UniProtKB/Swiss-Prot annotation:
Residues 207-225 have a biased composition (Low complexity). One of the essential components for the initiation of protein synthesis. Protects formylmethionyl-tRNA from spontaneous hydrolysis and promotes its binding to the 30S ribosomal subunits. Also involved in the hydrolysis of GTP during the formation of the 70S ribosomal complex. Residues 181-206 have a biased composition (Polar residues). Belongs to the TRAFAC class translation factor GTPase superfamily. Classic translation factor GTPase family. IF-2 subfamily. This is Translation initiation factor IF-2. Residues 96-122, 158-302 are annotated as: Disordered. One of its GO terms (cellular component) is cytosol. It is found in: Cytoplasm. The gene is infB. Residues 399-406 are annotated as: G1.
Amino acid sequence: MTQMTVEQFAHDLGMLPNLLLEQLQAAGVAKRSAADFVTEQDKTQLLDYLRKSHGSSGSRTKITLARRQTTEIKQSDSAGRPRTIEVKVRKKRVLTTKQDESDAAGKRAAEDVSLRTAEAPEAPEAVPVKSVLDAEQIALRAEEARKRSELMARQAAELKEKQEKRRQQVTAQTEVKKESTQVQEPGSETAAVSGSVAATQPESTETAAVTPSATITVTTQTTPAAKERAPQKPAVKPEEKGEKKKKQARQQEAWKDEPVKRRESKARGDVSGGQEWRMRKDKHGRSRSDESQSQHAFSAPTEPVVHEVLIPETISVAVLAQKMAVKAAEVIKVLMKMGNMVTINQMLDQDTAMIVVEEMGHVAKIAAPDNPEAFLEEVDLSPDEARMESRAPVVTVMGHVDHGKTSLLDYIRRTRVAGGEAGGITQHIGAYHVKTSRGVVTFLDTPGHEAFTAMRARGAKITDIVILVVAADDGVMPQTIEAVHHAKAASIPIVVAVNKMDKPEANLERIKQELVNHGVVPEDWGGDAMFIGVSAKTGQGIDELLEAVLLQAEVLELKAVRDAPAKGVIIESRLDKGRGPVATVLVQSGTLRRGDVVLTGAVFGKIRAMLDERGKSVSEAGTSIPVEIQGLSEVAAAGEVFIALSDERKAREIALFRQGKFRDVRLDKLHVAKMEDVFGHQEDISTLNLIIKADVQGSCEALAYALKKLETDEVKINIVHSGVGAIIESDINLALASKAVVIGFNCRADLGARKLIASTGVDVRYYNIIYEAVDEVKKALSGMMTPDRKEKILGLVDIREIYRISKVGVVAGCYVLEGLIRRDAPVRVLRDGVVIHSGSLDSLKRFKDDVKEVKSGFECGLSLKNFNDIQQGDQIEVYEIVETARVL
C-alpha cells in the first residue's frame, strides 16, 4: 500500500493542506508540515475526532450555559458619603440539542459569556476555541441566527398589547399609592423619602419620570403596601443604632427594590429592565431614567408597513406577493375569498391585482412599463392636410354565394378569374386595381360562402365603397343581409348591383322591395343607395356601375399622404414553399418600397420582393394599391395593420415584446380545471381531433369556423393544430400522437410526409372546396354520435298451460296471439298488465322440435331463463331493439 502525504490527502478531500494540518493537530495527530506521511491509524483517529465534533451518530448532548452579569449601584449613606455596591447575577441554563447544533450553540454561548464578562474586571477571560468549521457551515449557522432574530422580532410585536396594558396598570397603581400613603400621625417622627414609580413603554426607550410632587411619606410601621414593595430581605443592614430618623432613612434605602434582585419577566421581548418598579435617583434625590439600560432595546414597529405597488398589465401571483413583501399563500387566501382558485404561477390581470393590493392594505398604482411600442408614437403618422392628395377608392364586392360577384369583376378586368376558382366559388380575398378613363379603382372580391364571415368583415373594414351584388332571379339571401350589416356597421355607402338582368325572370322592383326591409333604400324612393341593373354575361350596365362608384368616391373626397412611411392592412397571408411567408397587403397611406422594414403584430421583416396582382415585380406601391410582399419572419395574421419603419432593430424589439405579451395573454386564458368541472365531466362525449392545413390563412380560419359550428352536446371538434403551407412530417407526427385526422385544404403533403403517412396509416383528407370538407366532417360526427334506440313489438303470447319437469323446470304451453315469437328476442312477462320480469327465452319448441320462431295462430312450448314463477293466464310480450343512425 502506497503512503500518502498530508498534501495529497488534503487534495483528495478537496480542502486546504493548512486546514487539514490544524484538524490533525486538534485530533492529537502530530504532523508538522504538508510533506509528512499520513497512516491509516492517523486517518481513523482524525475520523473519530470529527465524528465526535460534528455528531454523526445523531445522539443528543447537553449544553450548559453559564452567564454572569456584574453591575454596580452607587448609593450614599446616612452621612452623605457615596458608596458603591457590586451586584453579581449568575444564570445557569441547560439545553438538550442535536450534536450538529451543539457547536453553534456552544460557540454563541462562549461568545456571549466573553462579551458579558469582559466588562467586569474580576471576570476571567474566555479562552478562544479553535474552529474546524468551513465557510459553508458558518454561513448556515449565520442564517439560523438571522431567522432566530426575526422570530424574536415577531414575538416582540405580539407582546405589544400586553405590555401596554401592564404599563397602564402600573400607572393606575401609582396614582392609588399617591392618595393612600399620604397619611401621617401627629407627633410621630417620620422620614420623607422621595420615591417615584415609572413605567417604560415597549415601543420606545423613553421613560416616564415621576414629578417631584409625587413624594410618598412612609411611616416607621410596616404597611401592607410596603410589604408588597419589599418581597426580599434587605441587602444592607443598618450599622448604627442612633437616631430614629437616620435609622428609618437607612432602612428605606436598604429595602429598595433593585433590578438585579428581582426575578426576570417570563415574557420574551420585554426590554424595560424592571424600570417600572423604581426610578433611579441622583445624589439630590431627584428621579431620573436610566437611558443606558434601554438604548439597545428592540423597538417593535407601531404601524404596519404600507408598500406602494406598481401593477403592470399582467402579473403573476408570486411576483405580486414579492412586491408586497408577503408570502404567496396570503395573496392566494385573499383571491380565494374573492372566489378565484389560483396558483402562484397564474397570471392576474391589472384590475384583479389592484383589488388584491388594496384588500391587503397597500397602495396600488398602474405601472408605466418600458414599452418599446412608445417608439411608434414618436413616428409622425398624423396626416398633413397640406401634403394630402386624392387617392383611388377601395371598393369591396360583397353578396351571396353564386350571385355573380367574381363574374362581374371578370368582365370589368376582362379576365377569367371565376373559371379558375375551385367549384366556381371564391375562397380568398382577391385584390385588383383597374384603370378606367376616369381614374383607378381598387376592387376587393370577398367570398360569399357563409363560412367566410371573417373575410367579409375584414373586407368591410378596409373599404371605402361596397358594391352589393344581388341576383335578380334569386333575391335577397342570408349572406346578402350579412353584407348589409357589415357595411352599415362600418358606415360605408352601398351601391347595389342587381346582376343577371339578362334572364327573363329578373325583377328589379322585387329586389328593391326586399332590400328596403333591411334598411337599403334606393335613391328614387328617397334613399341614398344607388341601384344599377347589370349583367356580367352581356356587359349590360357595367359602365353605369363604374360611373356610380366614381361618383360616390368624389362625394367622399378620399385623400391620403403619398410621401410618408407606408401604412396599410394585411388582406391575406400564406406560406409558399419556395418563397416563404407571403402577404397580400393594401397600402392605405404613404408609399411602400422594396427594402422597407415592415412591422405587423408580432411579425416583422424586410421586403425582399414585391409583386402586383398580375405577378409582375414592382419597386413601390402607392396608396390604395394592393401588392404581394415577401420577406416576413413568419405568416402574418390577416386583418392586422402593418407599418413601415426605418429602424430594423427597433422593429425586431417591438415584435419580440409583442410575442412575450401574447404569451402572457395565452397563459392567462389557459383553462384551470375546477372541481365542478371534474365532477361534471361527461364520459359519453365524443371528440374528433383535427389538424387543418390550408393554402392561405383566411381559408384556414374559415374552415375552422365552419367545422366548429358542427359541434353538439354529444360530439365535439378539437382543432389540435391549424396552419398554412404544405403538410409536413411534424404534422403527421402530431396527428399520430393525438389520433387526429389531417385535412389539407388546397395543399398537399410533401415527400417526407407521404412516406410517413404510408408507414403509419394516418388518415389524411384533401379538399379544394369548403362544401366537401364540411360535409365529410359532418358525416364523421354523425357516425360518432350514439344511435337512437327504439323498441319494436314483435308479438304477444298467451300462456295456456304450465308443466313442471324435474330436469328442465317450468315449461309453459303457449298460444301466439299476435305477430310472432323469436328464439333470440328479448321478452317481458306481463301479469294483469304489469311487467313482472324482463329477460330472454331459454328454449322454444313446437312438437318436441326446437324452432327459431313461431308465428301467429300456432301453439308452442317455451321456458324462460332464470325465471320459473310463471302462472296460467300470464302473457309474454316479444320485442326487439332497433337502432337508428342520427344525423347532424
